[in-house]
Curated annotation (Swiss-Prot):
This protein's encoding gene: coaA
Protein name: Pantothenate kinase
PANTHER family for this protein: URIDINE KINASE
Keyword Nucleotide-binding recorded: yes
GO cellular component, as recorded: cytoplasm
Organism encoding this protein: Paenarthrobacter aurescens (strain TC1)
Length: 323
């Protein structure tokens, strides 16, 4: 099997901490595996504007789910060896996977597909997915802090709440609760929560989940959410591709989410094609692209696996950190 190494100029010897695999090489890793999802599953998991199909699942996500299952099994073996060494019987904690990437890059679809596929592997029937949207400050609080135009930037999140949530899950808490976010009202839903009860695997999906810890007020380094990840994935693509995907999704939302009377963006439902494109590109240039360049893209090198997409949303390259 042919495997090439990604070269970097950061190291004098030209070595890289990543192994680079092209689509063809990666797909061969699942040649003998049975496809666990059917067309109905894929239709249900597909995101708006994301042309996920059976071929993509078989060639990309099937080998990825197998790789993740190997990591989960290895963590179980390490837990058993550690408890034997310590002479103490401690309960195994959930395996936590982080999925990061830009708005509109398709990370939510990838997270949903991985959840469904990992549920079908032996040993991990209970797989939960949490998005960091639930840890955005409520709209009223964002307005009070003058952060509405910075929604999605690191400062718009309750980072302490997110860190506490992941820490408690990783610590083995029987039940952990998170706020519920509505993409229709664009706000936290009062009185509604996401409840996670000791899953085998927890997938945490969001823009900034790979961000490093910020220095504390006392000058000491704090903890980052990614400190609790057992595996992390960054979904990558050219910025120009992501912009087009964002604009395309915005157009389609006019007849779906935006069309609902209770939608925060209901005013956009009647925009013409030209006005919709102009509005979407304005939002992209003003908010999403700066956030990508300043906060999201710089975390790419912190991931254990980088999935690079082509203009048609298909994964064309994988960079896997060497063990």
């Amino acid at each position: 099997m042919s495997v090439t190494l990604q070269r970097t100029e950061a190291n004098g010897d030209g070595a890289s901490p990543f192994v680079e695999l092209d689509r063809q090489t990666w797909s061969r890793l699942a040649a003998q595996m049975e496809q666990p999802l059917n067309e109905e599953d894929i239709f249900r998991l597909r995101g708006l504007g994301d042309p996920l199909d059976m071929k993509e699942v078989r060639e990309v996500y099937l080998p990825l789910s197998r790789l993740l299952h190997l990591y989960v099994e290895a963590s179980h073996q390490l837990h058993a060896a550690t408890t034997t060494f310590l002479g103490e019987q401690t309960q195994r904690t959930p395996f936590v996977i982080g999925v990061a990437g830009s708005v509109a890059v398709g990370k939510s679809t990838i997270a949903r597909v991985l959840r469904e596929m990992l549920r079908r592997w032996p040993g991990t029937p209970n797989v939960e997915l949490i998005t960091t949207d639930g840890f955005l400050y409520p709209l009223a609080e964002l307005k009070r802090r003058h952060l509405l135009e910075r929604k999605g930037f690191p400062e718009s999140y309750d980072r302490r709440g997110l860190l506490r949530f992941v820490s408690e899950v990783k610590g083995g808490a029987e039940e952990v609760r998170a706020p519920w976010y509505s993409h229709v009202t664009y706000d936290i839903v009062p009185g509604k929560e996401v409840v996670v009860r000791r899953p085998d695997v927890l997938i945490v999906e969001g823009l900034n989940v790979l961000a490093p810890a910020r220095p504390r007020m006392d000058g000491k380094q704090g903890l980052a959410v990614s400190d609790f990840f057992d595996f992390s994935i960054y979904v990558d693509a050219k910025t120009s591709y992501i912009e087009e995907w964002y604009v395309d999704r915005f157009r389609k939302l006019r007849t779906t989410a935006f069309a609902q009377p209770e939608s925060y963006f209901h005013r956009y439902a009647t925009l013409s094609d030209d006005d919709a494109e102009s509005t979407a590109r304005g939002i992209w240039k003003r908010i999403n692209e700066p956030n990508l360049e300043e906060n999201v893209l710089p975390t790419r090198g912190r991931a254990q696996l980088v999935l690079t997409k082509d203009a048609d949303h298909s994964i064309r390259r994988m960079l896997l950190r060497k063990v």
